[in-house]
């Protein structure tokens, strides 16, 4: 004779518990959450690695752009009223040396390394140096 109080926690009906809709849904949610956490964690690690690898290159290019723009602005401030070409060159440099153009994917190899000298930096360094020579100002090294 079976006593109804023998198994108050209903542990003998494991099969029914495993098929409970609430538990199935809970298991699915935990599984999805674990999957998403794994994806997010992986992306964060790769993003950080990419940032760590690319930051020195971006910082170097940014510094070079800053030097070019600083020299052109200084020359334009001093000589721009009498030199229309210099004023135009400064405006063109502002357009061409925007961050999205300097760091364009097309300039880098698949590993995001520069193959050679950066074409925009080289172009504008030469232009700035031409104006430096014209106005007897130390050029960009």
UniProtKB/Swiss-Prot annotation:
Note the SS bond partners: none
Q: Which Pfam families match?
A: Yae1_N (PF09811)
Q: What is its main location?
A: cytoplasm
Check the UniProt entry and state the signal peptide residues, or none. Answer: none
Q: Write out the ranges of the annotated region (deca-GX3 motif).
A: 34-74
Cytoplasm: is it a keyword of this entry? yes
Q: Where in the cell is it found?
A: Cytoplasm; Nucleus
For this UniProt record, give its keywords in alphabetical order, as a comma-separated list. Cytoplasm, Nucleus
What processes does the entry annotate via GO biological process terms? Answer: protein maturation
**Cellular component aspect of the GO annotation:** cytoplasm; nucleus; Yae1-Lto1 complex
What does the function comment of this entry state? The complex LTO1:YAE1 functions as a target specific adapter that recruits apo-RLI1 to the cytosolic iron-sulfur protein assembly (CIA) complex machinery.
Subunit structure of this chain's protein? Forms a complex with LTO1; the complex bridges the interaction between the CIA complex and RLI1. Interacts with RLI1.
The family assignment reads:
Belongs to the YAE1 family.
Q: What else is known?
A: Present with 1500 molecules/cell in log phase SD medium.
Under which name does UniProt file this protein? Protein YAE1
Q: Identify the species of origin.
A: Saccharomyces cerevisiae (strain ATCC 204508 / S288c)
State the taxonomy lineage. Answer: Eukaryota, Fungi, Dikarya, Ascomycota, Saccharomycotina
């Amino acid at each position: 004779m079976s006593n109804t109080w023998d198994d108050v926690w209903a542990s003998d009906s494991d099969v029914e518990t495993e098929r409970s809709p609430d538990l199935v849904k809970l298991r699915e949610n935990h599984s999805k959450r674990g999957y998403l956490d794994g994806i997010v964690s992986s992306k964060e690690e790769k993003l950080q690695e990419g940032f760590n690898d690319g930051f020195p290159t971006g910082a170097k290019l940014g510094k070079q752009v800053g030097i070019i723009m600083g020299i052109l602005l200084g020359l334009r401030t001093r000589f721009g009223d009498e030199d229309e070409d210099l004023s135009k060159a400064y405006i063109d440099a502002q357009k061409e040396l925007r961050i999205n153009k300097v760091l364009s994917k097309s300039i880098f190899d698949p590993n995001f390394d520069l193959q050679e000298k950066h074409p925009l930096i080289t172009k504008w360094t030469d232009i700035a140096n031409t104006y430096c020579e014209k106005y007897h100002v130390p050029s960009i090294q």
